[in-house]
């Protein structure tokens, strides 16, 4: 049974994520203990709320350093919702700019849709060769609830680095990043733990990669 550390930094629906992971066969510990986080097979970083507040909470438990240490060693990390957003360079919400973890270039900004938050079920354009979306049909829907996102992707591969796999979604005129697969670091803007059977399959796919 794979062991997953669910990072407790004062943000995110921890119990919902814990139950979802346990249902697909993971052994889960809710923790911010560095020893437990670094030893786990996988680290899941949830996130609900404002970008700046989440980053402050993350730094208060040295979560940003733990994420960096795991990734430096090629150890799997997955972010959900704001847990995905904070992996980018920066975020700007309510006029407050904050630095993120800097794992990916890009800025989290408010969507331009008339109806916000983008809340409910939506399809995604899964990246070719995606491992997270393996076994899921193109018309599969996932549960979103957010008003901010990343609308521009600036990380292209070259001869030395492989470009991450980027999955997109559309809400009104906004096209935004719905998921990223970048070696050991993966993340989703939607909530797999609230996405029924489809979300369970995606989490199972991630667990199988650990």
Curated annotation (Swiss-Prot):
SUPFAM superfamilies: Class I glutamine amidotransferase-like. The gene is hisH. IGPS catalyzes the conversion of PRFAR and glutamine to IGP, AICAR and glutamate. The HisH subunit catalyzes the hydrolysis of glutamine to glutamate and ammonia as part of the synthesis of IGP and AICAR. The resulting ammonia molecule is channeled to the active site of HisF. Signal peptide: none annotated. One of its GO terms (cellular component) is cytoplasm. It comes from the Bacteria. It comes from Corynebacterium diphtheriae (strain ATCC 700971 / NCTC 13129 / Biotype gravis). This is Imidazole glycerol phosphate synthase subunit HisH. GO terms for molecular function: glutaminase activity; imidazoleglycerol-phosphate synthase activity; lyase activity.
């Amino acid at each position: 049974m794979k062991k997953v550390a669910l990072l407790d930094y004062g943000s995110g629906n921890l119990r919902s994520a814990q139950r979802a992971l346990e249902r697909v066969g993971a052994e889960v510990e809710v923790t911010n203990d560095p020893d437990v986080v670094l030893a786990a097979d996988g680290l899941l970083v949830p996130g609900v709320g404002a970008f700046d507040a989440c980053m402050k909470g993350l730094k208060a438990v040295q979560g940003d350093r733990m994420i960096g240490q795991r990734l430096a060693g090629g150890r799997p990390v997955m972010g959900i919702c704001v847990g995905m957003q904070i992996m980018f360079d920066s975020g700007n919400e309510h006029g407050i700019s904050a630095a993120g973890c800097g794992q990916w270039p890009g800025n989290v900004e408010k969507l331009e849709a008339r109806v916000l938050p983008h809340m409910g079920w939506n399809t995604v354009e899964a990246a070719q060769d995606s491992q997270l979306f393996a076994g899921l049909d193109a018309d599969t829907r996932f549960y979103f609830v957010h008003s901010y996102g990343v609308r521009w992707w600036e990380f292209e591969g070259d001869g030395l680095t492989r470009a991450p796999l980027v999955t997109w979604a559309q809400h009104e005129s906004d096209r935004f990043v719905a998921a990223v697969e970048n070696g050991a670091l993966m993340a989703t803007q939607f909530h797999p733990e609230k996405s029924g059977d489809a979300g369970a399959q995606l989490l199972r796919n991630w667990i199988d990669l650990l």
